Amino acid sequence: MEASWLENRWARPLHLALVFCLALVLMQAVKLYLRRQRLLRDLRPFPGPTAHWLLGHQKFLQEDNMEKLDEIVKEYPCAFPCWVGPFQAFFYIYDPDYAKIFLSRTDPKTQYLHQLMTPFLGRGLLNLDGPRWFQHRCLLTPAFHQDILKPCVDMMAHSVNMMLDKWEKTWTTQETTIEVFEHINLMTLDIIMKCAFGQETNCQINGTYESYVKATFELGEIISSRLYNFWHHHDIIFKLSPKGHCFQELGKVIHQCTEKIIQDRKKTLKDQVNQDDTQTSQNFLDIVLSAQAGDEKAFSDADLRSEVNTFMWAGHDASAASISWLLYCLALNPEHQDRCRTEIRSILGDGSSITWEQLDEIPYTTMCIKETLRLIPPIPSISRELSKPLTLPDGHSLPAGMTVVLSIWGLHHNPAVWKDPKVFDPLRFTKENSEQRHPCAFLPFSSGPRNCIGQQFAMLELKVAIALTLLRFRVAADLTRPPAFSSHTVLRPKHGIYLHLKKLPEC
């Protein structure tokens, strides 16, 4: 009798709990079903490749195969809907007129993508929106003024020559073929540490910050994998997965490096004040620290760490990829490499000194840089979440809430925009050809109010790196080990870039 009474006492609450759980599951299922039906309705006017009912276009997205995207761009020359699983869809665009309308608006960054990046980058320029983004943008813009960038030329040249000295030793003692991306990655990190944070780390020699470089690479892989794996869209499932655990540990490495940079610079500035040794110019970190000192409520410690994280990551990773791909393109096209070298020698001589003004006098080399950025854009896409409906040039509309992805790769390889888009042709960027082209046909640094704040710094770095390298070496591609693309947020070489080096005689 007593057991029966206990069973009856507990049966009702258990039944209620079970019914409640089933109701929650049913509500979630209905919500997902309605979401899918809404997306199907909104995207019905737009043709695209057939998607698997469960996986969507996941296989294509995870193949690191840009050729597949090229095929889609040929077949659908303006845009196409891209499904990530059954309940999430992006709208890809790669037409200049579509891009112009898209970039002229003030839609916020895609929340989901930047939620993935916030745990290790924080809330900096890359993923802020609205008044906070505007405040940070206004604050940081002076850090990229010409007067701040001019002294960076010597620091960049020093870092590049340090890398080239390593190559020269390798050339005299080993085979002439080396993997250059690893070296260039450390070199661009060295440049950022000097120019943006005022620190001499010798990371190219002593291996300092190798853990940071490794962490950024692995984090990029995890973020890209999670973005296109709808099973990992749920935070709890992702955190319980091996990749989720790895993500947390790698984030700690990033934060430790950032905190050390900030504290070291604070100490240096404090010592300078104590010694009455005030520096004449400020770097990126000095400007941010000054802003925080002026109003800690307006610019918190978290804001400070976020901006240092953002600039350190974006400033070295994308630059390293761009320089590596530039060398590879010139290695494949020796006639353009020779013409660049001749131009550089006529301006720089032996390269023992290099100035801001001289870098404005190498137009053909600049055209080769731009053609590389067209052929292999370091940031292959950018995304926004529509805050209000978007009417496209063909008259069709997308509703608020839709995620729109501007595929810069697709735009730069669109045969409706560029003749023979796979051919390396720097003459596309002569003044005459550039004036005849749609202003939104070439967007390596995006455009509009949210364009890349560091694009002038990046171009300066590319010019210094390629000028000094071509003065000392002739490069040729190792055709037995062609590079592959890695579909991170930055378009890096998946297994590095192998080049044959030939030391040139001194002028």
From Swiss-Prot:
What Gene Ontology molecular-function terms does this entry list? Answer: anandamide 14,15 epoxidase activity; heme binding; iron ion binding
Residue stretches spanning the membrane: 14-34
| Cellular component, GO, one term | endoplasmic reticulum membrane
Predominant location: endoplasmic reticulum
Q: Which UniProt keywords apply?
A: Endoplasmic reticulum, Heme, Iron, Lipid metabolism, Membrane, Metal-binding, Microsome, Monooxygenase, Oxidoreductase, Transmembrane, Transmembrane helix
Q: What's the Enzyme Commission number for this chain?
A: 1.14.14.-
The Gene Ontology biological process annotation of the record reads: lipid metabolic process
Q: Which reaction does this enzyme catalyse, per its entry?
A: N-(5Z,8Z,11Z,14Z-eicosatetraenoyl)-ethanolamine + reduced [NADPH--hemoprotein reductase] + O2 = N-(14,15-epoxy-5Z,8Z,11Z-eicosatrienoyl)-ethanolamine + oxidized [NADPH--hemoprotein reductase] + H2O + H(+)
Q: What does this protein do?
A: A cytochrome P450 monooxygenase that selectively catalyzes the epoxidation of the last double bond of the arachidonoyl moiety of anandamide, potentially modulating endocannabinoid signaling. Has no hydroxylase activity toward various fatty acids, steroids and prostaglandins. Mechanistically, uses molecular oxygen inserting one oxygen atom into a substrate, and reducing the second into a water molecule, with two electrons provided by NADPH via cytochrome P450 reductase (CPR; NADPH-ferrihemoprotein reductase).
Can you say what this protein is called?
Answer: Cytochrome P450 4X1
Q: Which organism is it from?
A: Rattus norvegicus
Q: What is the lineage of its organism?
A: Eukaryota, Metazoa, Chordata, Craniata, Vertebrata
